[in-house]
């Protein structure tokens, strides 16, 4: 049985009907509220404040007022805030994981991963203030010339429901660590995992008032955040359709924007692959967190000589993976996040079968629980081949030559993650180097991310930037060139 002891970060009295931040860094009543529904049980888990554009306008102004003092704080003092926030996430992790599992519908192992990665991101952020912040440049005698990293000012963060804690913290931590203030708008379906747990941790860690504002909201709040005059950068993680709107709106105001969007990711299985290993990787990539991951294995492109046997083994796994309430700690898959998303998944499966795909397993659901589904004979032009599904669907397409596998993998507007499994690493690498994706994994599946790697996609998967690891300084600061003369000199004018 999961540990259900109370955790100080889980405080319903703090966030019930409230938002976080303001000028004094406290919880304050919102004009509107929203129920948070547990996907597995359909029961109300919490009731939180819901931000509207006027709330966003106040929050961005308050963040802008607090930012200069935060950026000027001694580096060691800023670093200590992140270490204390990390310690808050490292305490009673089982209780945090259980809450995240209930709010997101993800299994406990996934929730435990979120808590651990959030703490790691904070530890990494603690090192940012103590790193070199610039370069000394060549200059003529009597003149000092250097370039330094300076914060954008206020960074607006819009985060999704699927991995809410990690995908919020991935932007919040480095943005704060580089001297910015942050206004965070988590998805209103997962406002606690994606926002208020972070607020509680930084509140406990002693982050100065006003530097972090957390306001769950809908699309109107997101648009207000993008357009707010005080916001210098937007970090958005979510669907390509929503990201395109964010990018267009940010472009009108000439704002920097980081877009981490969807994917249609291919796993290529070569004819010399170990099929037990390949089936295990394909199942994880397609079914983990019910396929609600931007890196999910949306296509399994298998050599024709092994496609039937790989399908058989994948079907066997799909039929035996337990589906149910993730809070039980005994299931491999939980629920889809909401009914609209479930119907979208089912519509893609049905349309693909009508177009000639073979339903080998699954394709059924009860409430929000969609069975792991295997489709074979999937071809280009079918919805299961072309579209991001965001559900637990393994779509298998055969190929005859390596060139055909490459062409099938690249036949998409997305470009996030690809993987190749085979006995010959040289052959797998030769294929991988011709795949158009931001992430490439050899002898692994497509779902992989660590705190230290640059993460970003091509095409419709993003705007060709990256976040994480060495990319964060580039994303959350900008260069300022500074020259200094001891005495002002005359000019030709």
Which residues does each predicted region cover?
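Rossmann-like NAD(P) dinucleotide-binding subdomain of oxidoreductase/dehydrogenase enzymes
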Residues: 133-277, 399
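ALDH superfamily catalytic-core signature
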Residues: 241-379, 442, 491-492
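Conserved C-terminal structural/oligomerization subdomain of aldehyde/semialdehyde dehydrogenase
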Residues: 41-47, 231, 268, 322, ...
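Residue-level signal for inorganic ion chemistry
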Residues: 42, 78, 100, 122, ...
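N-terminal Rossmann-like NAD(P)+-binding subdomain of aldehyde/semialdehyde dehydrogenases
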Residues: 1-143
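Short, flexible turn/loop "capping" segments at secondary-structure junctions
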Residues: 36-40, 61, 258-261, 290-294, ...
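Short, well-ordered beta-strand elements within core beta-sheets of diverse protein domains
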Residues: 45-51, 66-72, 157, 267-269, ...
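Structural signal for hydrophobic packing residues in well-ordered secondary-structure cores
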Residues: 67, 71, 86-93, 97, ...
